[in-house]
């Protein structure tokens, strides 16, 4: 009798399978009980779509609503395989273990992680369902790319079900320092789960080095000890007769598309309208973030408030726009954070604004893509001040939209993007005076200096786009077959 894992071998017909927590669609349940589907835009699907079409690709993920049907979906020529999650699954696996345990742990304990055995058990169970769905969809010898922190056990589970597959894993958030990761009660299980992959990818070499050390310490595996480079000099972990490759692959954006859209006449016109609606201030500062405690929105608001109070920023000719996309609205800590931020906005406007002319313009709602690009075109200074961020693509999006416009980027040192965007005004978000100095320098920079810096930033962003990121990872993954 064949081993249980072998029963699924070759049962699917997809040569390339992407596995992510979410499908690239938004599903909505209508009043009559039926469902509607619309395409969800994103850099990952944009980068992988040509490959998905060319290689009979499939995407495994959750459709976004509890108890959604598991029938395969064909959406705009893409083959999608939903994994159904119940309301309890969402509460324990997603809102619980993924976002109240892993998220804060991997973001340097900005808030305290919560360790619940029930959440962990559900995380294991849901990861198993994703692995089984992938095993059913993948053709013999297929390539599988697993995405992000919600699915860290899938590589090992899938390896046991389908040893014929070539499996890659990429972590889109920071991988924490060793001493923080060691707090995790299920630390060994996570590392062993990731070691089921043939290639484990991180944004930065530091994350790869942390993973190599933990693999040695927690599993006793032999690992390489030389430093890991960006898209080069890979680390290795010996797992039985397999060699797992470990690398750094900084993710990026579809920079050419953004560059093109930002030059569009209607977008430029809308950017002028935004400036007019704000009273044609001399300088517009912009923040664009998901409403999350890692993003440092409160830091930039406090810095801006103190600059106004100190008279280092003229309240009569400077405005700040803060776009905050709703996020995890049922989680208590996020509700409290939103209230704190809105209180800060109210304080600044009450102290420094005038009737009909607030100095901070705050929007707590999603903004259409073309409108967002118009904001990027309108803004003189972009504020990106996370306390910790794996990469931060907003910083790169702003740069891609600036073409002939100059401008300035204030960027937290604790973003992955800071390693690439060296011509930004870098600041430590934990040092308020440093953030204030960076904002003031960006506001007062010489126009020619601004154009020089922006040209350098744009060379980096336009040359290293999301397509190059995906190709670099998949080329390295393909090389593991011949290793």
From Swiss-Prot:
Pathway: Glycan biosynthesis; trehalose biosynthesis
Tree of life domain: Bacteria
UniProt key word Metal-binding: no
Disulfide bridge partners, by residue number: none
Enzyme class: transferase
Gene3D superfamilies given in the database record: Glycogen Phosphorylase B
Keywords: Glycosyltransferase, Transferase
EC number: 2.4.1.15, 2.4.1.347
InterPro entries: Glyco_trans_20 (IPR001830)
GO biological processes: trehalose biosynthetic process
Site feature Involved in alpha anomer selectivity, where: 103, 173
Reaction equations catalysed: ADP-alpha-D-glucose + D-glucose 6-phosphate = alpha,alpha-trehalose 6-phosphate + ADP + H(+); CDP-alpha-D-glucose + D-glucose 6-phosphate = alpha,alpha-trehalose 6-phosphate + CDP + H(+); GDP-alpha-D-glucose + D-glucose 6-phosphate = alpha,alpha-trehalose 6-phosphate + GDP + H(+); TDP-alpha-D-glucose + D-glucose 6-phosphate = 5-methyl-UDP + alpha,alpha-trehalose 6-phosphate + H(+)
Molecular function in Gene Ontology: alpha,alpha-trehalose-phosphate synthase (GDP-forming) activity; alpha,alpha-trehalose-phosphate synthase (UDP-forming) activity; trehalose-phosphatase activity
Record: residues binding UDP-alpha-D-glucose: 42-43, 290, 295, 393-397
Entry keyword Transferase: yes
CDD domains documented for this protein: GT20_TPS
Subunit details: Homotetramer.
Protein family membership: Belongs to the glycosyltransferase 20 family.
Task of the protein: Probably involved in the osmoprotection via the biosynthesis of trehalose and in the production of glycogen and alpha-glucan via the TreS-Pep2 branch involved in the biosynthesis of maltose-1-phosphate (M1P). Catalyzes the transfer of glucose from UDP-glucose (UDP-Glc) to D-glucose 6-phosphate (Glc-6-P) to form trehalose-6-phosphate. Probably also able to use ADP-Glc, CDP-Glc, GDP-Glc and TDP-Glc as glucosyl donors.
Descriptive protein name: Trehalose-6-phosphate synthase
């Amino acid at each position: 009798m064949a081993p249980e894992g072998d029963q699924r071998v070759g049962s699917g017909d997809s040569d390339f399978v992407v596995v992510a927590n979410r499908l690239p669609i938004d599903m909505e349940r209508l009043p009559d009980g039926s469902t509607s589907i619309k395409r969800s835009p994103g850099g990952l699907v944009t980068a992988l779509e040509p490959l998905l079409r060319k290689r009979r690709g499939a995407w495994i993920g959750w459709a976004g609503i509890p108890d959604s049907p598991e029938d395969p979906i064909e959406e705009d020529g893409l083959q999608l395989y939903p994994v159904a999650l119940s309301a309890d699954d969402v509460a324990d696996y997603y809102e619980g273990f993924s976002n109240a345990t892993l998220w804060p742990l991997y973001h340097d304990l900005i808030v305290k992680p919560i360790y619940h055995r029930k959440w962990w058990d559900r995380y294991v169970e849901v990861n198993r369902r994703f692995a089984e769905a992938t095993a059913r969809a993948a053709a013999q010898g297929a390539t599988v790319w697993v995405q992000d922190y919600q699915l860290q056990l899938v590589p090992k589970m899938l390896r046991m079900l389908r040893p014929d597959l070539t499996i890659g894993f990429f972590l889109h958030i920071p991988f924490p320092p060793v001493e923080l990761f060691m707090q995790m009660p299920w630390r060994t299980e996570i590392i062993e789960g990731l070691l089921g992959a043939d290639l484990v990818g991180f944004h930065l070499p530091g994350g790869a080095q942390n993973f190599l050390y933990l693999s040695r310490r927690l599993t006793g595996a032999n690992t390489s000890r030389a430093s890991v480079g960006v898209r080069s000099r890979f680390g290795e972990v010996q797992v039985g007769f397999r060699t797992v490759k470990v690398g750094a692959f900084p993710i990026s954006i579809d920079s050419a598309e953004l560059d093109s859209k930002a030059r569009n006449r209607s977008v430029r016109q809308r950017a002028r309208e935004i400036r007019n609606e704000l009273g044609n201030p001399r300088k517009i500062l912009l923040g664009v973030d998901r409403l999350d405690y890692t993003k440092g929105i409160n830091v930039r608001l406090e810095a801006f408030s103190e600059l106004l109070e100190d008279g280092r920023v003229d309240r009569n000719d400077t405005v700040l726009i803060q776009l905050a996309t709703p996020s995890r609205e049922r989680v208590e800590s996020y509700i409290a954070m939103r209230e704190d931020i809105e209180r800060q906005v109210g304080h600044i406007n009450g102290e420094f604004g005038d009737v009909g002319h607030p100095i901070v313009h705050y929007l707590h709602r999603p903004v259409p893509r073309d409108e967002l690009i118009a904001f990027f075109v309108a803004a003189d200074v972009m504020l990106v001040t996370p306390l910790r961020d794996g990469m931060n693509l907003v910083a790169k999006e702003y740069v891609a939209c600036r073409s002939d416009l100059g401008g300035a980027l204030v960027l937290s040192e604790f973003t992955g993007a800071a390693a690439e965007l060296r011509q930004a005004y870098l600041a430590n978000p934990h040092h308020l005076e440093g953030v204030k100095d960076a904002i003031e320098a960006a506001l007062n920079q010489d126009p020619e200096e601004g154009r020089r810096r922006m040209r350098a930033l744009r060379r980096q962003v336009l040359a290293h786009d999301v397509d190059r990121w995906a190709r670099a990872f998949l080329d390295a993954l393909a090389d593991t077959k011949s290793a």
